[in-house]
Regions:
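Bacterial N-terminal signal peptides that target proteins for export
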Residues: 1-7
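Short, linear, compositionally biased motifs with a strong N-terminal bias
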Residues: 12-13
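C-terminal motif of bacterial Sec signal peptides marking the signal peptidase cleavage site
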Residues: 16-17
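Cysteine-centric segments in proteins
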Residues: 21-163
């Protein structure tokens, strides 16, 4: 599911027959859909006043080291794949975030956040989903990515709910 589809889901939950659902429930449903589609962004509360609550698209997960160690062949391979589409350098990497890690299979759903002056976001970052699944039987790691269409994040989505 793309971020736009996640937002459409949120809009449907809010405006079509879910009058008894709170805005928090709608956000939770949208975030579940975003995470299930390995989106690099979720909707997070960024401000709250006595009158309103603001949610914006923010990188998913918690700041955490990647399972691809710095300087390893795996991190080199990840950057090769990202650079087939985009031109981010290792020095552009702001942080890695762990969304999910499976202890049994070592599958990881990570979000790599890059400083990006061409990002449409106010914070000038672009987040990319990096999915890594070790394949010990053949001695490698399967990789998959969720990269913005033009490599740079669009303006962040913002929702403001009145109290």
């Amino acid at each position: 599911m793309t971020f736009k589809n996640g937002i459409l889901t949120l809009a449907c939950v809010l405006f079509v027959g879910c009058a008894s659902s709170s805005s928090q429930r709608a956000i939770d449903i949208a975030n579940k859909d975003l995470l299930n589609s390995f989106n690099p962004y979720i909707l997070a509360k960024t401000n709250e006043t006595k009158d309103a609550v603001t949610y914006q698209s923010m990188p998913a997960g918690d700041v955490w080291p990647s399972i691809a160690p710095i300087g390893s062949a795996l991190v080199v391979d990840v950057f090769k794949e990202i650079n087939k589409v985009c031109n981010f350098k290792y020095s552009d990497l702001k942080e890695t975030r762990m969304v999910y890690f499976d202890d049994k299979t070592s599958f990881s759903y990570e979000v790599w956040v890059f400083n990006d002056p061409l990002s449409g976001r106010d914070d000038k970052i672009t987040a990319i989903t990096v999915l890594l699944k070790p394949t010990p039987d053949i001695g490698g790691t399967d990789m998959d990515f969720r990269i913005p269409a033009d490599c740079h994040a669009p303006k962040q989505t913002t929702f403001v709910f009145g109290k």
